[in-house]
Regions:
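Conserved active-site and cofactor/substrate-binding residues in soluble primary-metabolism enzymes
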Residues: 4, 8-11, 15, 57, ...
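Glycine-rich, charged/polar anion/phosphate-binding loops
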Residues: 21-27, 82-84, 119-123, 158-161
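Phosphate-binding active sites in nucleotide-utilizing proteins
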Residues: 2-55, 60-65
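Structural motif
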Residues: 39-41, 73, 175
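Cysteine-nucleophile active-site neighborhood
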Residues: 45-124
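Short, glycine-/Ser/Thr-/acidic-enriched flexible segments
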Residues: 1-2, 27-28, 43-46, 79-80, ...
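Generic hydrophobic alpha-helical scaffold/packing signal
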Residues: 10, 14, 39, 49, ...
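Amide-donor transfer/coupling interface in amidating biosynthetic enzymes
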Residues: 106-205
Length: 205
């Protein structure tokens, strides 16, 4: 359900000293213990919506981690999973993690496709104001928010610009897939946020 990651992203995270631990919401796994960061990538959660909806261990574990302030990046399918629900093209609605106040509705036609320039906004932990990276969008769903969130970035393409992405706690979530090799500063930013979270945990003991 969440199997799309640019391999360069994982390589760059490892090169900066990150230890990557894997778990599967489809298998109802909890988030590995004592993590300092969380990465939920893209995929097709709508194809596994019923199974994901029933896997409460994974959903509650992820929600708890985000609410604790674990620096989290969620891209496309991962973003969809963190909303309150996914509605299929058949009109069936399945409850998801529920951290983001809104739902996702699937369409039979593409909602977005193509490469994007990404401009950081609101000095979020991943992209500071003025930092630029590249990535892409590819999705058939639309997000219908119930609450307003500060936009994490501005996307520019040949069709124009839009301010999107959600900032919530230490969560950056949206449809765009980041390509960290386009600006490795994003990796440094994320690693630093994870180290700060790790230090906060130590100080709380």
């Amino acid at each position: 359900a969440f199997n799309f990651y640019y391999e360069e992203n994982l390589q760059l995270l490892r090169a900066r000293g990150a230890e990557l631990l894997f778990f599967s919401p489809l298998a109802n796994d909890p988030v590995p213990e004592d993590v300092d960061g969380l990465y939920i990538g893209g995929g097709f959660p709508e194809e596994f919506a019923e199974k994901l909806a029933s896997n409460e261990v994974s959903k509650q574990s992820i929600k708890a981690m985000i609410e604790k302030g674990v620096p989290t990046v969620a891209e496309c399918g991962g973003f969809m999973y963190l909303t309150k629900s996914i509605e299929t093209t058949e009109g069936m609605s399945y409850p998801m993690v529920g951290v983001i106040d809104g739902k996702v509705a699937m369409q039979s036609t593409l909602a977005a496709l193509g490469y994007r320039e990404i401009f950081g906004m609101n000095d979020n932990f991943l992209m500071k104001e003025g930092e630029v990276a590249k990535g892409h969008e590819f999705h058939y769903s639309i997000f219908q928010p119930n609450s307003l969130y500060p936009p994490a970035y501005e996307l520019k393409s040949r069709f124009g610009a839009k301010r999107v992405g959600c900032i919530l706690h230490s969560l950056i979530a949206g449809y765009v897939h980041f390509h960290f090799a386009s600006n490795s500063k994003l990796v440094d930013n994320w690693i630093n946020a994870c180290l700060q979270f790790q230090e906060q945990k130590r100080n709380a003991i």
